[in-house]
Amino acid sequence: MILSEVLPPKSAKRIHPGEFEAHRHWYPKALNATIHPMVNFFLNLSRERMINRYCHLHPIVKADALAELLDYKCKHFLWAGADLLNVTSASARRQMVIIENNSCPSGQKSMPLTDDHKEQGGYRLLIERSFKPFVQKKRSGLQGALAVLYDKNPMEASGYAAVIADVMKEDVFYVPFFNDDPNPPVRYNADAQMEVRDENNEWHLIRAAFRYVTQRPWNRLHMHTKTRIFNPV
């Protein structure tokens, strides 16, 4: 017997504002940890001070050129992470080396809070600075709900869904969207707009989606859809 014939089809879960609970979206060790003072100091530096410190350590770098790079705003690649290695060369030169960029980076669940009074931490920072402005530039007349699509890391993906609900003050669909799902809870209608299926087998239009889909996303996410996708393929 085929397993898909036994298990019920996956469906989107509706997340309401006010449902965020920190213990669901951080590892206990990180949630109870205190961030290192040096790291916290760096994260609170102004852009100008960061540029000055970097140019002091790298005299050949021009401050204006670095400022221009930091001012650049991508059209499509709005959210990224990087894997870094602290390396030392044969001549004893130490530096950080970027070995990979990620379009759906993880790490929020491992990052201690920089401010104990802001319990949503980096989740809210990302949503307020990136996703909210992205959604507010919506296409004229496009109706529908918001969604978080994921195929990994439910601890963080659900955290983003809960924070989006709080920031945008509306319900958000939290949607599993796996590469090998024979009956996925996501489809596109005749107008090329995304729809998601809830637990009652009802389909809902989506005007914008936060992508946490990493395994061959091009197999499932249409390039030419009316739904705005945060970090499209």
Predicted features and spans:
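Preference for protein termini
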Residues: M1-V233
